[in-house]
Amino acid sequence: MSAATDQILEQLKTLSLLEASELVKQIEEAFGVSAAAPVGGMMMMAGPGGAAPAEEAVEQTEFEVILDSVPADKKIAVLKIVRELTGLGLKEAKDLVEAAPKAVKEGIAKDAAEDAKKRIEEAGGKVTIK
C-alpha cells in the first residue's frame, strides 16, 4: 500500500463506532453508493432517477439446481458430477443422489445453475432449475 492509504487506514482504526457509522453515511451520500450487503454476490447499481418503479418485475438472481431423478444405470456418473459440483464426500453425495428429488446447489447464479444442469444431464440425471 502507499503511504497515503496506510495513513488513512491508521486514522480509520482510531474511529469510534459512532464516528465510523457517520463516515459510512457520508461516503454513501458523496459517492451515491450503498454499504448494504449485496444479495447473491452481485451489487445492484441504482440507475438515474433513484429507486425503480414498483411495476417492474423483479428478476430472479439466485437459483436452485434440483436433481429430480437418476436412472439406476447412470447413478455412478451422476454421483461423480454431484461430488465435483458440491465438494461433498462420497457417502454424502451418494445419499443426495439416492434421495432425489433433492437440491444439489442453492443460491447460485443463473450461469452456474445452467452449467450444473448441463453437466448432470450429460451424465444421465434429470434436473430442474428453480
Swiss-Prot record:
Coiled-coil regions listed in the entry: none
GO molecular function, one term: mRNA binding
Name under which the protein is recorded: Large ribosomal subunit protein bL12
A biological process from GO: translation
Function: Forms part of the ribosomal stalk which helps the ribosome interact with GTP-bound translation factors. Is thus essential for accurate translation.
Annotated Pfam families: Ribosomal_L12 (PF00542), Ribosomal_L12_N (PF16320)
NCBIfam families according to UniProt: L12
Keywords attached to this entry: Ribonucleoprotein, Ribosomal protein
CDD domains: Ribosomal_L7_L12
Matching InterPro entries: Ribosomal_bL12, Ribosomal_bL12_C, Ribosomal_bL12_C/ClpS-like, Ribosomal_bL12_oligo, Ribosomal_bL12_oligo_N_sf
Family: Belongs to the bacterial ribosomal protein bL12 family.
Lineage of source species: Bacteria, Bacillati, Cyanobacteriota, Cyanophyceae, Nostocales
Subunit structure: Homodimer. Part of the ribosomal stalk of the 50S ribosomal subunit. Forms a multimeric L10(L12)X complex, where L10 forms an elongated spine to which 2 to 4 L12 dimers bind in a sequential fashion. Binds GTP-bound translation factors.
Gene giving rise to this polypeptide: rplL
UniProt organism field: Nostoc punctiforme (strain ATCC 29133 / PCC 73102)
Gene Ontology annotations for the cellular component aspect, listed alphabetically: cytosolic large ribosomal subunit
